[in-house]
């Protein structure tokens, strides 16, 4: 998953043929191996050595945030390689994982899930984490920008409202990282072993870039419509 993103960041430093092969390999592993049609198009975290599903805690472990994050990497690769069908597939997969992982009772996206609906091994499974929601903001707004699917915009607005109203500290800098299932601050710490200066600035920057593009497009469309007397 990370290699999908890294490939685009360092492709100007390495041989073009090597990078294209690397991108193709990454796309295949994510979209043809870990994405499982028999699970309705959901993405799993762990497989047997022969790429079959395994029925154990690790094999049933689902991480909606990871899958949704991976999909905006794939969208970027699809754009770079001029493969619109890949962009659409990544967008559709992101929406499936989002609908799957969304907590319909309290809102927010579950941290971990079990694909068979069994109790997850991880005790923190029902927490709501900052990075999961930030990466989802990127995926949904990129999906809307690249495909025009209104579902992406609807989800972006829903996730945006949840994220800014729950994770942002209104009194002090930096965001909270860990909420309980009800969306209440579980840990007041702003940094630690797993929460560093990465997901938040990258996420805000990525969203800003896409929203700037959309803003320019809207201004251009409005200007053209005015010129035509619409």
Would you name each region that the model predicts?
Residues 221-230:
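Single conserved hydrophobic/aromatic residue that forms the stacking wall/gate
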